[in-house]
Amino acid sequence: YEIKECDWSSDVCSSDLAGIELVVYDLQDVGVRYYTYISTLSYMIEACAELRIPVLILDRPNPNGFYIDGPVLESDCNSFLGRFPIPVVYGMTCGELAQMMIGEHWLSVRETPSLTVIPLKGYNRNKTCQLETAPSPNLKDLKSVLFYPSLGWMEGTCLSLGRGTPGPFKQFGHPEYAGVTHSFIPVPNAINTHPRYAFKTCYGISLDTLQWLKHHPRKIELSWILQAYKSIPSQVPFFESSFDAHSGTKQLQLLIKNGASEAQIRSVWKKNLDLFKKRRQRYLLYPDFKNS
């Protein structure tokens, strides 16, 4: 089966699994809540548990596994972009997170899932890891993967994130973005057949010169969305209906609209973030990163 295309929550998929002895999960994730491989993984484990099929995870490095940041998902923002109370950047491998899903009883199962994780050898989450394969066509390299936690939730806004250009997730902009000179024109291609603002000139910010491979700030760069909100004309609706699902909270949109500073925003999600950091410790398979 193509795991990303199968509807693991459907009765049809459950019937298709009949007779299968083992399901193996081997995907390169990026360690961001709204990157939906982990939601697919959770549905897969649930479907397999229903039929008592064991699951084997071949663990892979988390390229954003060296920090934890962002709001913890609130229950009223639950969607395929986030099913469980974890922050945007959760600092765990897929194997570790799967163990947490089971251990915290987050999954909708009647039978305890049979899960085995084949761990990595010598994994050091303090170091930025090189990826053997691109996680997806629009996350082409490690640089875009590192930018993704700070950019991905902007897909719930009026901004283009460069889909349909040579540099998706390395820039962001809008046809009416004010006060900048960088520009790009999204064009349909085999990967992005209907990119936002196709054939229109978008003005905005290029991130390609940032040296995050060497000097990562170890946090979500909130200044990007705060700057973008101030740079789009007020008559243009900035937030779209999916933003709360991306951010995992209804508070962030309101805070930005009310002009909250980065420090004020971080203070709102700090308590739940600290609780998650403690909660995740019991599920770690590898030494934690420093200053966790």
Regions inferred by a protein language model and the residue ranges of each:
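Single conserved hydrophobic/aromatic residue that forms the stacking wall/gate
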Residues: Y1-V12
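Glycine-rich oxoanion-binding loops at beta->alpha junctions
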Residues: S10-G19, V32
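A short helix->loop->beta-strand "cap" motif at the edges of active sites that frequently abuts
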Residues: E50-P54
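Glycine-rich, charge-decorated loop segments at or immediately adjacent to ligand/cofactor-binding or catalytic sites
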Residues: L56-N78
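Glycine-rich, aromatic-lined ligand/substrate-binding cores of catalytic
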Residues: K121-A198
